[in-house]
């Protein structure tokens, strides 16, 4: 079968490899049909992704069709359309036993710690495979990135009536903003790109959008009844943005890091203390988040149009080499 391998930073190749087979009784062989390209893949290609080694097959935002199942698999059958939870957990560490499988101490993320889905077929344990019958393949492949946003909102313990600023109007950030809106929050978005802000305001139904400026704190207060937001989500993965995020939260507020940066973050403690702020990290997502996102997509709460660029499988190495990642969300299609 065909497979795309990131051999080392800035080097990607289309290769021929043997088709995977069922190895365990609970395995599922999936014919991959859609692959989302996300910041993790882009950072890995550029050599800036933590928790990473080469060579590596990227791809963890996946949709496909069940091609074969192991003898113990009961909830799936050949022909089912599915998506994949790419966070393979040990099930035995303290976080896992507490239900926090998304931050398992021994986690193996498909496409990061283990080879991913940038190929024609992938074998996955059945407990990480979710039926998406009723969703298009395009939509099934965006369940994972949207689940990241949904998890961040749940992690923040957001309640209706709160005000939220999401910094970074990329694929993860707009998911955060949309699910915050669905929870009853007043939502604001901030990004350097006017194009992204125009798209995200419509897609998320945000109350207002901003570009960073010296006046942005006053602009936020003007749009938010004189107050700064109670929760600030940073989805940029940018060190300077993540440190600046503290400035935008009101006293008693929260800052949630949804993005990840391979660097040290610092802040001025007297300001942090004076505001009695809460700083939270949000990592990956759980089965609960995936099911919530699928339900939201099925009931129409999530709009169409999240994917803004389509790429053929064979053209994927060329897309990475060109390095133009300004589109909101790119997706690889393997359908003939």
What annotation goes with each model-predicted range?
Residues 20-35, 48-94, 133-135:
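Glycine-rich beta-strand-centered segment in the early N-terminal region that forms part
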Residues 243, 287-336:
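C-terminal hydrophobic helical "lid"/dimerization subdomain
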Residues 198, 203-278:
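Glycine-rich cofactor phosphate-binding loops and adjacent beta1-alpha1 units
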Residues 193, 261, 285:
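Residues in the short beta-alpha loop(s) of Rossmann-like NAD(P)-binding domains
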Residues 90-167:
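NAD(P)H dinucleotide-binding glycine-rich loop of Rossmann-like/cofactor-binding domains
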């Amino acid at each position: 079968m065909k497979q795309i391998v990131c051999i080392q930073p800035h080097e990607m190749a289309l290769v021929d490899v043997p088709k995977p087979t069922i190895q365990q009784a609970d395995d599922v062989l999936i014919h991959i049909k859609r692959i989302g390209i996300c910041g993790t893949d882009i950072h890995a290609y550029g050599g800036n992704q933590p928790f990473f080694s080469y060579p590596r097959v990227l791809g963890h935002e996946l949709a496909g069709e069940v091609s074969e199942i192991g003898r113990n698999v009961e909830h799936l059958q050949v022909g089912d359309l599915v998506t994949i939870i790419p966070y393979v957990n040990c099930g035995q560490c303290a976080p896992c036993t507490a239900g926090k499988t998304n931050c398992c101490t021994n986690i193996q993320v498909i496409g990061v710690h283990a080879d991913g889905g940038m190929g024609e077929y992938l074998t996955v344990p059945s407990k990480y495979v979710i039926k998406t019958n009723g969703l298009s393949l395009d939509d099934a492949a965006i369940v994972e990135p949207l689940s990241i946003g949904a998890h961040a909102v749940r992690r923040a313990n957001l309640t209706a009536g709160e005000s939220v600023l999401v910094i970074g109007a990329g694929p993860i950030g707009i998911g955060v903003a949309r699910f915050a809106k669905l929870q009853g929050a007043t939502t604001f978005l901030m990004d350097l790109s006017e194009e992204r802000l125009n798209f995200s305001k419509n897609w998320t139904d945000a109350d207002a959008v901003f570009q960073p400026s010296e006046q942005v704190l006053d602009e936020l207060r003007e749009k938010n009844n004189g107050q700064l937001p109670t929760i600030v989500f940073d989805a940029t993965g940018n060190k300077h943005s993540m440190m600046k995020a503290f400035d935008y939260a009101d006293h008693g507020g929260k800052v949630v890091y949804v993005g990840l940066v391979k660097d040290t973050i610092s802040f001025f403690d007297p300001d942090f203390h004076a505001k009695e702020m809460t700083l939270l990290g949000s990592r990956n997502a759980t089965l609960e988040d995936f099911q919530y996102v699928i339900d939201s997509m099925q009931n129409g709460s999530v709009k169409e149009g999240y994917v803004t660029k389509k790429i053929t499988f064979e053209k994927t190495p060329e897309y990475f080499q060109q390095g133009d990642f300004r589109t909101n969300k790119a997706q690889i299609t393997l359908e003939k």
